[in-house]
Amino acid sequence: VCFIVRHHMYDLNNTAKDKTLRRTFARWGFERSLEIADIREADVHGSGIITGEVESAARWRILLQKMQQEGVPFSARALNCSGADIMNWLSLPASPAVGKIKAALLAHCAVYPADNTPARLKKLACDMLHRDTQDENRL
């Protein structure tokens, strides 16, 4: 219930870019994203302002269907790598950094689902670590 209350007003004006929606939906998961679309539609209809199709809910459903057809991972578990893989690839100990990298990989694959392969995820993870290291050296 808290999740629904917190997110049912997300992108109320239907102005979020598809890339932004993809990343958000991957973070929320497929079922929860559909549920929020349903709640959005019910909320708008309940207000009496619109009786027909609710543009944002319809757009979300279409995008979610497309994402599902493309094989977008809707959870960190659906990525074709594990935290252990990331630790091995990057010679990292178990730490919050591993989870941060995995979350970034999920966001990336929400937009570029074809990159959800072990080889591509390894390269992306290495690039992320290298970029973070460069950023730390600038401080």
Regions found by a protein language model. Name each.
Residues 47-139:
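Charged substrate- and nucleic-acid-binding regions of tRNA-handling and nucleotidyl-transfer enzymes
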Residues 1-54, 72:
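Histidine/acidic-rich helix-loop-helix segments that form or flank divalent-metal centers
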